[in-house]
């Protein structure tokens, strides 16, 4: 049976269970986590990604020099449209 190619997701979630047989020979069994573990891992990763996006966004805002109300409004609308477009495609 062919094993699917490793991806960062499978590498970060699966682990190898090493067992010893009675004759002392070791066998390795690849174990995949249960659904609860996968969801926990997914939520942790997504929280890290979301935090990174928020930090990057605030750095961009702080880098603006003397923004006018109109330029801020335009910038917010552009970011909102981009955010909504990405949300619909993912």
UniProtKB/Swiss-Prot annotation:
Residues marked Low pathogenicity (site): 66
InterPro entries (UniProt xref): Flu_proapoptotic_PB1-F2
Main localization of the protein described in the UniProt heading: host cell
Sequence similarity: Belongs to the influenza viruses PB1-F2 family.
Extra information: Is not encoded in all strains, and seems to be dispensable for replication.
HAMAP family in UniProt: INFV_PB1F2
Name of protein: Protein PB1-F2
Gene: PB1
């Amino acid at each position: 049976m062919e094993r699917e190619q490793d991806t960062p997701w499978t590498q970060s979630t699966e682990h190898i269970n090493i067992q010893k047989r009675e004759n002392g020979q070791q066998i390795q069994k690849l174990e995949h986590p249960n659904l609860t573990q996968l969801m926990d891992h997914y939520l942790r990763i997504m929280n890290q990604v979301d935090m990174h996006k928020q930090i990057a966004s605030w750095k961009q805002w702080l880098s603006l020099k003397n923004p006018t109300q109109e330029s801020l409004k335009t910038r917010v609308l552009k970011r909102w449209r981009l955010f909504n477009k990405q949300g619909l495609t993912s």
